[in-house]
Amino acid sequence: MEEREERVRDDTIEEFATYLELEGKSRNTVRMYTYYISKFFEEGHSPTARDALRFLAKLKRKGYSTRSLNLVIQALKAYFKFEGLDSEAEKLKTPKMPKTLPKSLTEEEVRRIINAAETLRDRLILLLLYGAGLRVSELCNLRVEDVNFEYGVIVVRGGKGGKDRVVPISESLLSEIKRYLESRNDDSPYLFVEMKRKRKDKLSPKTVWRLVKKYGRKAGVELTPHQLRHSFATHMLERGIDIRIIQELLGHSNLSTTQIYTKVSTKHLKEAVKKAKLVESIIGGS
């Protein structure tokens, strides 16, 4: 009986994943939502708001942050709607997140971090997180074919909300990509692959986090991948680039998400410079 129930539950989770994909959710979101819903049912809960609150209370006691709890609530609400339980979904309220300002790095700190890289691959990872403002998942999903050398752009596929976007990159960054690709001796379609595995699988987010932390320590900076993205936005704004352009480059659907950087930056009145200057100022100091 238990085995049959487990099989039915697995089938339901699979159907839920398909529903999320059809709703346009990113692979990352589908993975996280199905993970939490699986946990929810593993603990014997039923799809009701009351059981959802019990589940959330337990996670909070375990030390889950408000941000993490928000993600679980979004997963539960999505599942309830999938099951046609809109009234139960409405009972779950998302707590307000405190608006914290992202900590931006100085250009000198970024330079130290880039110069700390031990391989061409690692250097390029850091340069793309900073110089193109990529999310970790976007970086890991990049394929060699997504780099258009003729037009000087990369196609970022399946960003937040499952949206693709085109990001222009500088000549300096294109040269770094060419140099890195020339050093590769595998036929993986992905731009970045795991170095230590015999089979060259695409790079995992966990590896990116580990590398970023490592080079942050070497450069004497407490660092996360998202900080490099934050710094890209802040430094662009400081150089006079219009916030709507930064919004497009970051792949933000709402301008209000990007506008948080106006509170961090203090040099808005500088004359606008070409985007290429941002990366060249880092590489030029190497």
Curated annotation (Swiss-Prot):
Domain Core-binding (CB) span(s) in chain numbering: 7-84
**UniProt keyword list:** Cytoplasm, DNA integration, DNA recombination, DNA-binding
Q: Which GO terms describe its biological process?
A: DNA transposition
Question: What residues make up the catalytic site?
Answer: R135, K160, H226, R229, H252, Y261
In this chain the Tyr recombinase domain maps to: 100-274
| GO molecular function terms attached to this record | DNA binding; tyrosine-based site-specific recombinase activity
Annotated GO CC locations: cytoplasm
Effect on the protein of changing Y261F: Lack of recombinase activity
Q: Which intervals of the chain form a coiled coil? A: none
Q: Does the keyword Signal apply?
A: no
Q: Which InterPro entries does the record cross-reference, listed alphabetically?
A: CB, DNA_brk_join_enz, Integrase-like_cat_sf, Integrase_catalytic, Integrase_recombinase_N, Integrase_SAM-like_N, Tyrosine_recombinase_XerCD, XerA
Locations listed in the record:
Cytoplasm
Quaternary structure and interacting proteins, as annotated: Homodimer in the absence of DNA substrate.
The UniProt function text for this chain reads: Site-specific tyrosine recombinase, which acts by catalyzing the cutting and rejoining of the recombining DNA molecules. Probably involved in the resolution of chromosome dimers at the terminus of replication. Binds to the dif site.
Q: Which PANTHER family match?
A: INTEGRASE_RECOMBINASE PROTEIN MJ0367-RELATED, PHAGE INTEGRASE-RELATED
**Family assignment?**
Belongs to the 'phage' integrase family. XerA subfamily.
Q: Per its UniProt record, what HAMAP family does this chain match?
A: Recomb_XerA (MF_02055)
- Protein name as annotated: Tyrosine recombinase XerA
The record lists the organism as Pyrococcus abyssi (strain GE5 / Orsay)
